[in-house]
Amino acid sequence: MTTTTAEGGGGVAPFVAKTYRMVDDPATDGVIAWGRDSNSFVVADPFAFSQTLLPAHFKHSNFSSFVRQLNTYGFRKVDPDRWEFAHVSFLRGQTHLLRRIVRRSSGGGGAKRKEEAGGCGGGGEAAAGDVDEESAVVALEVARLRREQREIEGRVAAMWRRVQETERRPKQMLAFLVKVVGDPQVLRRLVDRDNTNAAASNADDSAVHHQVKRPRLLLDSSSTTTTHGDRHLVTAAADGFYAGGCGPEAAAAAAFVPDDAVDFTGLYTGGDGFGNAVVDAGVDYPPAYAFPVVDSGY
């Protein structure tokens, strides 16, 4: 096979022009774009490329056919691990060089055909290269399809688990309703259990509240008194508190005097509380104070 070039005159091949427009379009950089050195192009997403760009520019959506056409126009694959192709006349911004990229074709003469068939066997090597290129394309497509199949199977399995869970809940509800119909006491026991738990919780809260509540100072009938002359001294109450206060100081200082014996100013009135008191009219000093004086530090 021989490669013909059109350095003078002639236009750009439609396939080359369309390929250049796809590569040079910034809107499609996620699918097809220029290489790092701008002397090659990379098909980043062959699946999206075959589904969107190929039908828009060509009459097919076969990525393998696109690769075969690239090989026919002299493009070569640069990186074996990705779809990167290059041509000496396919450069970014150098559109005037595109006319040099022409389709490779065999000569019309018999001599040329014999020469191509004999010699070094260049035609056979080119055909073998085409077959290898197509085999590589098919292998990559198969690998991609297997990967997509695994992803789809994973999504289907997840959906199936959700469906099973959705079906299990109505079955559980139906089983519960059947149980309630067969034994109406089941629902009552559940309600009673909830009420019991709520009451226990309220009781615990009430107990905590009473623990922090301050005790009331009460003097009940269990208090004991002792008589010291004409006074009745409250010594203790059953709950440990004393009249007028609490603690040993209040127990030592508090004295009870009947209301009918002493008025509100503390003066003796002659009531029953001090019936044995002797009043000396000839003494010119006031009678003894009815309440004991306790040394309080003043």
From Swiss-Prot:
One of its GO biological process terms is:
cellular response to heat
Q: Where is this region: Disordered?
A: 105-128
| SMART domains the UniProt entry points to | HSF
GO molecular function term, any single one: DNA-binding transcription factor activity
Recorded hits in PROSITE patterns, A to Z, give: HSF_DOMAIN
Chain location of the short sequence motif Nuclear localization signal per the record:
213-216
Q: Short name of one Pfam family for this protein?
A: HSF_DNA-bind
User: What processing steps or modifications follow its translation?
Assistant: Exhibits temperature-dependent phosphorylation.
InterPro entries per record = HSF_DNA-bd, WH-like_DNA-bd_sf, WH_DNA-bd_sf
Keyword Translocase attributed:
no
**Sorted alphabetically, which SUPFAM superfamilies does this protein's record hold?**
Winged helix' DNA-binding domain (SSF46785)
UniProt GO cellular component terms: nucleus
Query: What is the annotated localization of this protein?
Result: Nucleus
| Complex formation | Homotrimer.
Query: Family, per the entry?
Result: Belongs to the HSF family. Class C subfamily.
Describe the task this protein carries out.
Answer: Transcriptional regulator that specifically binds DNA of heat shock promoter elements (HSE).
What this protein is called in its record is Heat stress transcription factor C-2a
Give the organism, scientific name: Oryza sativa subsp. japonica
Please spell out the taxonomic lineage of the organism that makes this protein: Eukaryota, Viridiplantae, Streptophyta, Embryophyta, Tracheophyta
Q: Which gene encodes it?
A: HSFC2A
